[in-house]
Amino acid sequence: YDVDVENGTLTERSSVEVSNASHMAVSKNGKYLYSIEDEGVAVFKRDKNGDLSRINSVNIDGMRGCFLSTDVDGKYLYVAGYHDGKVTVVHTHKDGRLGSLMDGVFHTGLGSVAERNFRPHVNCVRPTPDNKYLCAVDNGIDQVKIYRVNKLRNKLELVDILRCPRESGPRIIRFSDDGKFAYILFELSNEIRAYKYDGSGKVPAFELIQTIETSAKKDVHDTHNAASGLSLANDGKHLFCTTAGEDTVSMFERDEETGMLTRKFTLPISGEYPKDLVLLPDDKHLVLANHASNTLTTFTVDYEKNIIVMNGKPIKITEPNCIRIWPVPEE
């Protein structure tokens, strides 16, 4: 899609075929787009017209992944495996090609939720902002496992485990741009936990400073609801999350000094099962991927009135899972 940032609208430009493209990530240099596919991971480049062409793909020696991220230097691609509980690291090359697998680790342990088969389900992998560690959020066993990426031995080394409440279902972790705070979204308990992060010691330190519900309703633990998406505004002053089931988006004001969150609104999103959301670069417009209703919906955010206003009709698209903004480089 072409993005009209000023008006907050999307116009379809082109498409490329990928088998089960459940998640995407843009390379650190902004030149390439990585995508999950059934066979592993694929990488694409964009021409001057915005069309995508495949560079290559790699097999990850496991079941289809569900989440992608890159390290701070752009040398590695990290893959989360929900179905097999695996964390995979793939080498990347300057010319865009995906290289060999650096390492892969299968999580072990028993979870507390029967619907998840009591098994590990890695839902998100993201490096710490200081690039010292890799956080693997395991939705099945209620843990965030923290690894050191040993570049000399080409190994993932487990250094710590952040244990979450039973049956909370951690889903996504995001860090503030200054690297001082981490926010974890919990799918089953429908809450966000804020942590102070300090990577200066021998092991990383995560200090819990706040727990806040994703929904404004009294019965936040309604089993029909599932916290699903988490996004920080580009200026770092607000945090947004979605809750499937009740199908809402919530906005929180973020204190940049303390990292604490204050709810500003929880509003309906005119779609079903909002799996992902993203702010446009101006932070004035919000785009949501509504998986069950097969739509994208766009909104203008009014920060003074604490409301969102829908921009036009929903855009039809089959079972959207992930949205990424890919800026066009300035010539």
What name fits each language-model region?
Residues 53-124:
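Asp-box/WD-like beta-propeller blade repeats and closely related beta-sheet repeat scaffolds
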